[in-house]
Amino acid sequence: MDKTTGKKASKKSLTTRVMLWLWGILITGILTVVLIFWLICKGMLGYLPPLDELQNPKNKFATEIISADMQSLGRFYRNENRVSVEYTDISPYMINALIATEDVRFYDHTGVDLKSLMRAIMKLGRAGGGSTLTQQLAKQLWSPRANNIFERALQKPIEWVIATKLERLYSKEEILTMYLNQFDFLYNAVGIKSAAQVYFSTTPANLKMEEAAMLVGMCKNPSLYNPRRRPERALNRRNTVLDQMCKYEYISQEVCDSLQALPIELKYQSVDHKQGLAPYFREYLRLVLTAQEPQRSHYSEWNMLQYEIDKRQWETNPLYGFCQKNHKPDGTPYDLYHDGLRIYTTIDSRMQQYAEESVREHMMDLQKSFFREKRKKSYAPFSKDLSTEEIDAIMTRSMRQTDRYRALKKQGMGEAAIRKVFNTPVEMQLFSYNGQIDTVMTPMDSIKWNKHFLRCGFMSMEAHTGAVKAYVGGPNFAHFQYDMVSTGRRQVGSTIKPYLFTLAMDEGMWPCDSTVNDSVTLIDGNGVAWTPRDEHLANQGEMVTLNWGLEKSSNWITAYLMSLFTPEQLVSLMRSFGIEGQLDPVVSLCLGPCEVSVKEMVDAYTTFPNKGIRVEPLFVTRIEDTNGNILATFTPQTHEIISETTSYKMIYMLRNVMDHGTGVRARFRYGLKAPMGGKTGTSQNHSDGWFVGFTPSLVSGVWVGGEDRSIHFDNMSAGQGANMALPIWALYMQKVYADEELGYDTEEQFDVPEWFDAEAGCK
């Protein structure tokens, strides 16, 4: 063999070895890839969700609160404000923009787009990662954050496997819907429904093309293309999306050019539980739905009555503790914050808006009067009757009720050190009706500042159905979160008198029955004499009717009626009217020293326009799960309290209160012409102003007063219920009647038969 032949053989041998090595590397690579995918498919390498989890992804959806007129009132959620929507509820603009920009061959591939993948590999990722929408969905749902290079290298193969499985389990429309429901658009806008609401104050179905393009632009990198913090980048990215839509013939060049010329016009609404419509109602609903079964050991001895009330609610009210009483198919209780429930309420968003507007309008004016009266008074905002020591005691008690105090106490600080903190100026935001005030003030002074603001509660419900249409628990939920509709109880004053008059009417008396208008002395159970005062001295000694007595809110006529019955009889009747709080069986009960909530008073007064039948407040009509399955429906609970004839007598007298008595202000100042009844109330020292009014269809109640009973006007004309509370009701009714779409007619009459004659018993 010559040297040439040897060299050729050597080269051939080297080539063979190289080829064998290359084939070996290729085969090994292929086998390695096959092995990796086999291990992934078996769940032995990385996490691969099982079939049942792929079929039922564990999404955390917020619970949505929906008004009677199908408006979203808000949501309950933790961490993620996500609400599920259906494919048919998403604008086609959103779908087209998403496909044109993120995955143009979406309808052609089966989870992995090989063409895009190869392009990404050839260009080393500079042309994008090649991920399909299905892969992105897989990453969103099941790809945890990688902790090392090995885990990061496995992420893509795992996503490919999951994506192919998703494509077999779901239709293309379902995958698009899941993707848009899952994506986080920042600012607590998780999912397309939240994003449409937060950025444009609209729904996914009503997104304009340029709005949809902006949101799709955020899908590439929401932080980088944040329209609030980086508007220029967001605009450029939106225009890129529009170019893509034009490129793939979803829109014409002319449309593209016209839309690109438009600026981004955000209608941003921050997601905050303390903001938005009906915040007090939403919080009330949250507490009721998540209530636990009452345990006696959790209540102090002095609070046993509240335990009995809560226990009765648990046993009789299906809404109370709903999440604990009802379980999902897997046996666990419903989670209000993650299970995506839909709660359909009785609240009407328009009437709720009118109620909040009425509260704000009147409370602003009333607050100005209160500030004027208390200006430069050293004891402000308290009554001039309080001593310095009494004021200090109130302020100390209020300090100890703050979150700041509890936090400092938990840190182990002593009382002296805590007081020093409370008397050290710090930056803070204070409430005012003209907007928040940024200032530097001591926490102690801020407590006193907040005490200057009068509080209120308002609730309106339909007399015959019990449907609660409006609920305002205070002047501003962000600053004053204590609910004065359901939680707070205050002395009711003369609004209690209709119960005693009802007792008399039910026992056979008539509005036209007369008695002497004179001082009455009663003896209570302890043998102590009680003689109430009265303002109507000009009529002293005259014969007056019971109708006149209620019309003028006469204490003497009320005391006369009280002399005909026992306190126990009055307590019993009030219990049947739905009053659950402390009721002491004493003769003075007839003038309203007892503490009652606005909700209870409104509930009770439904008895009058409803022919003697009390209708309990109905807050929710049905609850659905995230798939639209009905979990529960709710109907009004009714109780027959008095006879129809008695209710007719009471309507007659309470209408006269509005036409000629203490409620006449609604007629001459606010111009209300519709048939209506009602009663004002003012507690001792005019600490509490009340008004409960009703029309043939609506019953509404108002309370206004200070945070403490020692905070009140110094004169009766300003502090009476007709001045403090009635105007809110009157403003609300004006707005309700002005909105013809609501269907409340000023010509509607009370359902009193023609044969009824209020004077019949005296003829």
Model-derived features with residue positions:
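A penicillin-recognizing enzyme superfamily signal
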Residues: T345, S349-D365, R397-E462, A467, ...
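Active-site-adjacent helix/loop patches that line small-molecule binding or acyl-intermediate pockets
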Residues: L141-S143, N148, R152, I347, ...
